Amino acid sequence: MRRRAGAGARPRHDSFSILCAVSEILALIVLTNVHTAATGPPCRTTKAGVTVGRFQGLVGIALILGIIILFSRHRHAIKWRTLGVGLALQVGVALLILKWETGYEALKWVSDLIQKLISFTNEGVMFVFGGLVSEDNGFVFALSVLPVIIFLGALIGGLYYLRVIQVFVHFVGTALNKIMGTSKVESVFAATVIFLGQSEAPLVIKPYLSKLTRSELFTCMTGGFAAAAGSTLVGYSLLGAPLPYLLAASVMNAPGSLLIAKALMPETEESVASVNTLKVKDTESKNLIDAIGNGALSGGRIAVIVGCLLIAFIALIAMVSGGLEWFGSLFGFEGWSLEGLFGILFAPLAWAIGVPWEDAAQVGNFIGQKTILNEFVGYTSFGPAIPDLQPQSVLITTFALAGFANLSSIAIQIGSFGGLAPDRRADVAQLGMFALFAGFLTNMLNAALVGVIMGL
């Protein structure tokens, strides 16, 4: 049974404390702008040729931190250590890849290794599709991206059976548990979604799902929405997004999701699922070959879902845009489209997280497509536009889109969590929109942080 902890305890943090915290962040922004005005122009060019508005993303960071405190279900129960350490871990990862050459080169080496693995997919594709695979046909999504998802699904299935992935999951999960003060279940799940994604990761904590507190369940759901994991991560790179940045975003999502979730829904109950050792093993596969086969089939299901959603959503975008264009022409307005509407709605957010204003409408469109429709739709539009965007816009957009936080994912989580623990299905459905909001904020916080660090 789950019970409330410290029900009669006096709140440690009142509204005045929260107001002071937000005021300090805003004061930092003001002081930064004053310093900038006194010491130099509002932007500079980095060694990579990136012109960055100094600390523009601090607006987005302050906005997001203010939102999670304002909308927190139990402000008095917020553990500031979790917020502070989570933010520090995100900043640390961003510094490693953006400001430490050795760190970036190490990530680039991993990226190149993954690209080499991807190239082996061509052998299987050419055998199955033969002459359809040709450079003369150019980039064909169904033959270039979807087979990679299947291959990496098989590879991850094999590594999972051999317990290679579990070593990383145990290490990262234990580290997050000790450093951030989150429960073992939450921490392991946050590490697991780096590899397995939102639909497969709940299997890892299946024995504990029924025992999770409401806060723990919300945190796991947030981790799923914020994640950009496994085979789909490489799929984004094939659409044009830089793979090193995608890998960094995937890692940053782990502490980021814990930070956001534990601020929006702090723990007010005593966890009974926080075991000392949480065993993670493949119990469904009989042997390595069976595990690889199951992984391939799992990847195949994801590939089919991705293909179906892209066909449906891109067609719907065209239909709605055509309707808007026709409706606008009746009143003398030309060029109305769904993309333009997304751009208008999300442009202020894009600017707040560090995107230059001249690119804000375009990036806002990508964020809107990713959130309302699907992240693959967002990356499909983002890839061809990369040459026309400024380098910092490409960096920030890559991080902003790297997550499953979209409306269709709510149904996926209800199916995955609810299927494994039917007694929690109602809770999952109830928390769905709020957890989606938390996952979205996680992705935006990552994007704002890397924008600020790039400007240092």
Where are these regions (language model features)?
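N-terminal alpha-helical transmembrane segments of multi-pass membrane transport
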Residues: 40-145, 290-293, 306, 310-318, ...
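Alpha-helical membrane segments and immediately flanking helix-loop junctions
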Residues: 177-238, 363-449
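Hydrophobic alpha-helical hairpins/lids featuring a short glycine-rich hinge
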Residues: 120-122, 127-182
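Juxtamembrane inter-helical linkers in multi-pass membrane proteins
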Residues: 170-204, 271-291, 338-342, 370-371
